[in-house]
UniProtKB/Swiss-Prot annotation:
Pfam families, per the entry: RRF (PF01765)
GO molecular function list: ribosomal large subunit binding
PANTHER family (alphabetical): RIBOSOME RECYCLING FACTOR (PTHR20982), RIBOSOME-RECYCLING FACTOR, MITOCHONDRIAL (PTHR20982:SF10)
Protein name: Ribosome-recycling factor, mitochondrial
Keywords for the protein's UniProt record, in alphabetical order: Mitochondrion, Protein biosynthesis, Transit peptide
Family per similarity comment: Belongs to the RRF family.
GO CC terms of this entry: mitochondrion
Primary site of residence: mitochondrion
Annotated Gene3D superfamilies: 3.30.1360.40, Ribosome-recycling factor (1.10.132.20)
Gene that this sequence comes from: MRRF
Function: Responsible for the disassembly of ribosomes from messenger RNA at the termination of mitochondrial protein biosynthesis. Acts in collaboration with GFM2. Promotes mitochondrial ribosome recycling by dissolution of intersubunit contacts.
Amino acid sequence: MALGLRCFRLVHPAFCNSLAALTRPVSEVTLQTVRGRQNDHGQCMAYAAVPVRHFATKKAKAKGKGQSQTRMNLNTALVEDIINLEEVDEEMKSVIEALKDNFNKTVNIRTSPGALDNITVVTADGKLPLNQISQISMKSPQLILVNMASFPECTAAAIKAIRESGMNLNPEVEGTLIRVPIPKVTREHREMLVKLAKQNTNKAKDSLRKVRTNAINKVKKSKDKASEDTIRLIEKQISQMADDTVAELDRHLAVKTKELLG
């Protein structure tokens, strides 16, 4: 009996440490030192790490800010074998950056020469930005000049593109020189810019949908690499990332709208 109790006392610490390790997140490496009473030497027990990536669920989003969120645990190694979510995230972020750049260049109360740079002109050689086929300069605070001397054959197409840019511009032509009067800052002009901002935001959302669709299609093609539950979980995560990006696009639109309307 005494021998049995002694053995139990020796085994008990290691047994408890093992149980404690099982209750910890699988993403941690648990290293416990078991103090043996036999020679007072430390013995180490290591548990292998399993990489895990944590994501918030839509249900968690609905709880509101400042509250604890339920997290989805995705095995990083398993997910990366199917799709690189970080690359998908970068593509979605690039959509946001493109919209912000668009707002800064083309959706401003005061029209500047830079606002005309990326107006797309349909030419015989394809679609080209206006600044590649012309010289754009500021004649005065009320007038922008677009010199088409290098590509005179594109003058008519350039005028059409400027007029249809959505920036409320009415170009006038003198030979190969296009004069673009800068519109006065009226309430109507502000509202037209808001409309343009919404159009550009919708285009950004279209680009985002393409990123989401391409990512999900890639996941669907990997059904032989993972279970249906894993595939479905990854698809939900991609959709959630897209939803978060849409919310960010809407936030930038709201800020821009407030700026334009004063």
